Amino acid sequence: MKPGRKSLPKKNRASNITEKMPTTSTEAQSSSSKNQDRCRSFSQELGVDDEPEEQQAPVATPKQTKKAQKTAKTTEEVKSPRKSARKSELKKPEPEEKAKEPRKSASKRKSSSLMNKDEPSTSTEAPSADVPGTSEASDEASEIQEAPENPNSALAIKKRLMGGGESSKSAPTKNPPKARKSNVKKPEKEAEALAPPEPPAEPQEAAETPAPEPLVPEKKPKIEDAPTTSSPKKSTPTSAPPTRASARVSKPNRLYADGSFNTEILGRTRITEQNPVKEAQAKESTPELADLPLPAGRRKSTAAPRAPPAPKPIPVINGVLRGYIPSVKVPLAEYEVDGEIINLNEGVNETMDTILAKVCEDGVEKHEDIDPKVVKAKKLAKIDYTKRLKLQVKKLDIQMRIKIPSTPEELGKRKRQAPKTDDFYWSAQSRTKLKGSSKEREETPAFDEESPIGGDEKRQQKARESISHLFDAEMDASIKEAKKYSVSFDKYIKPKITGALKHAKIKLMSRKRQSAEPDDFYYHELLVDQVSPSNSNVENVDVDVDIEETDDKVDPTEFEISEEGVIGIRDEAVDMAEQIALVIPRPTKHDGSPMSMDEIQMRAMEHVESRTKCLDGSLEIVLNQLGHEMAPPTRGVEEQGCQWHTVTSANAQALKNLYTIANNCTEDAITWTHQFMIENLEVHMLASYLSILKYAKRLNSSRFGYVISSTDQLDPEWTQVTSLLKSFVYKRHTEPGTEVLNNTIPYHRMTDTVFLLVPPTLTFGDHQRAPPRHHARIFRWLQSIGHQDSEFISFDEDIDATCSVAEYLSDVIVERICDKVRQKNKYRPNCNVVLVGYGASTYLIHRAANLVEGISAIISIGFPVMTSLGRRGTADDEILLTYCPTLFIVGAEGRRFNNEAITELRTSMISPSGLVVVGHSNDMILVPTSMLLRLGISQTVVFRMVLEKILDFLNLEPVRQQEFADLVPIELNNVFDLDSALLKSDKALSGLAFASSTHSASSSAAPSPVGASGRRATVTGAGSEDIAKRRKESIILSQQIAAPSISGPPPPAPSPRTEDRFLAFQNLVASTITTGDDMPRRASMGASPRVIERGDFRDHRPPPPPPLPILQNPVATPMSQQPPLPSPAPPPPRGPVDPASISLI
């Protein structure tokens, strides 16, 4: 390798190729002279002759900005002194070369120097003859110029990039490629050896350069363009524009200066290749910011940063921090020290306030609710939030409504004058005619709003209205058709009724009237035995199925006995058991055969008694489930699904009762039993256990979730098994055999009824997500059938969780029910409000019915008529005064059901009531498992029949067609509200003081009697004329009783013990007693009397004996002079009597 070639810097040898990239002809012509000179300098370095015409025009380099110039200057100042010396040495032949070429302007020299400064390496000037190795480099250049090659060709660039220059030096060819740039930086010693000696005159030349800026310590002289030989200007050959003009062409040394290069020059896809060696070199050569000389205006100060200002202390005003409400502090007494009295409250409390605020953060957050402004703001925020929710609901209602476009009815342009939307159907000639006619019509004046409407206009308006009405009717019909449920309940239940009669001799339900009394409002029985008729149901003798006949025939597949149906139910459980068996193999004997159940139980006997006892109970439940699943099928596929669901639910309830935690030993036994059964049970038994576990998870989610997760962290195998169990158990299951049942629910069929559902388990707070109970299914069905505002009644958030008094919680929920009823009547005045209770909550809804108005009906499911204090429906029971129709649904086998008590309750109520008796069920309307297996149905089917009876009761005309004015609680008199003037009388406490004064008898109307229960009857049914007539009769009767007879003993005084005078005594007492609160109320009741429809409070005493004749002396008193015998007392009234007056009879 020649020394001259080696001494030349590598970056000068790898000059900017991007400057030689072809551009458009306009650029080449605009800067031809400048680019030609630059091209000559570059070609000398590369050893390429630029004389041939095939050379493409170089790319014009854009001018640099001042910012780029400063950057280049700053970068050059950091370079080594040897490089600067070398630059000055290379600068010596500059005047000779300048004499050959035309003189350049100052601006061109400035631009060329800026472009050369932008390059990362030194100038590309050829070395002079004084420097050793210069002659050899010129000889080499002359050899290379003999066979020129286009340096911008793809082959030359590729050779330079791939390092073909080193191989060409040993064997020179026509076009020796350029040496590849070395990625490794040379050491300093090698660079010093190869560099030429420094001349002594370098500092003087450097001093002759223009003075740099005052703040910059050293500045290099401007480096002019490289010397080139003058050559005549050649016309640039026109060539096709390049396929792609990259944005990187404008940057001179972008290809080689960076650590990445653009290979798109070679015609490849654009890829950016990273060179880690060059990146490391760039990091090493890049000076630190602290070493760079910066100008005075932009130099950063090296002083330490200022500390942040200290936060301002919180002001303490009168011992209390601002915005701080202090906690309660005990007042401290003053004490004396050395004759000086010290007040501790001022010093200690101030210090405590500051400590609490800074350390404990007490006061501001914990006591914000004490501030009345904060409390008021919170209430206002809740009110605003409620209003926003209501507005949002209204907005959604408006959006969900079907908007029917209708024609406008305003006067003006008619529809035929509107622009045509189907112009493309018309020809060009017709279209022009329409446009011309429309223009003429637009010029005509429109109708005046005050002008009378013509006959044609009226007819058109009527036509538009009729069209819109027809459209509305069609839309309503389509909506109703879409809302229809797909399967009728009669079609679904008919085969089940037939199967129950065939297998169990039990009639599930009937549509016919089942009451023996014609006056009974509504009475039905479900699941009735057909063996012997009962007294209350005369139609049980009929064996015919009275469900409405349908044209569709019963599907014969429902009664097909198929073993595949039973196997298909537990397929999922069997698959999961097989997956668990793959992870944890089943135990085997020494010979490899599987262990029997007896041997597995013998292994369990080694453990403590609590574990073995829990295992025995669990195995008994699993064997019961397995026995039912392995039994041969005897019913249809749907009945098999119902039976499997019934058995699995019962076994899940038993497992839930067994896995109830009592103490630490029991908890350990439960988790060990679960782990033992998962690890040792066979696949078919494990599938049965998994089915039970899945159903039990719904009964007590938290408990069984803990049991399943107890094996999670034992080892990796058990972790995998636990994840499999969770994926199976947590998956929501559907009850088999009831897929068609869900299609019989008439969703949104009673949109004019709002159901308020009061569950028997009332929860609040974190316990809102209680596990589903037996009542949840009926309540969800009713909520989906009724109006969208139907909801469950629960406790408010304001309830104190520590309070457990039943009376207090009952009053709270009753008040909540009343508030909901008032709210629904206010916002939904056209809807009927129906209260639904289940179990104990039925008492609460009946209590609320006596306090609030607007309840259309009450549904009492599982009403307990027998209580610990006696039966319901006695004379002083408020349930008798229920003003709305009531439906009682009771279980025939319940402990709190009594047929006579419920019959007397219904008869004594003043409003109509219905009764549905579910046979073979308990108080919660739950049918035993054995009975469900006989019938081939599940508990869900029983609830569906109960729902059908509820809908039948609500669709009765007396229930649907009630006036809102009649739905008002009956008002009772207050017996303690007496007239104070009555107590000031002297004869107030005398026996017949009121009877002796005719003035007091005629001064006021006769009130109703007051009973021992504290009520006074208010229903009289008499007008003002009847009151005056009865008052007159009572005065005459009292005068006859008070006047002594002429002869004979006087008649006995009236008393309640005299049976023949009982009615007269009652009339006398009723006509003489007066109170201050009776006149206005009785006067108002007389104008619009309220008729009592039903009642059973009759006189249950035996009929009175006939009156005995009065024995007198016939001689002393002739027959003509004897007073006439009083007429016999009329029979006791058989009609309805007010319940409040029953205590006086």
From Swiss-Prot:
The yes or no answer to whether the keyword Zinc-finger is present is: no
* Keyword list, A-Z: Developmental protein
Q: Where is the composition biased (Basic and acidic residues)?
A: 73-104, 216-225, 455-464, 1091-1102
What ranges does the record list as Pro residues composition bias?
A: 1121-1136
What's one GO-annotated cellular component? NSL complex
Compositional bias of type Polar residues: which residue ranges? 14-34
| Domain of life where this protein originates | Eukaryota
Q: Which regions are flagged for Low complexity bias?
A: 226-248, 999-1013
In terms of InterPro entries, this protein maps to: KANSL3_1st (IPR056519), NSL3/Tex30 (IPR026555)
What biological process terms from GO does the record include? positive regulation of transcription by RNA polymerase II
Region of interest: Disordered: 1-310, 429-464, 999-1025, 1040-1059, 1073-1145
Q: Has keyword Cell wall biogenesis/degradation? A: no
Pfam families assigned:
KANSL3_1st
User: Where do Basic residues bias regions lie?
Assistant: 1-13
Relate the protein's function as given in its record. Influences the activity of genes involved in vulval development.
The name under which this protein is listed is Protein sumv-2
Q: Mind giving the lineage of the organism this protein is from? A: Eukaryota, Metazoa, Ecdysozoa, Nematoda, Chromadorea
Q: Which gene encodes it?
A: sumv-2
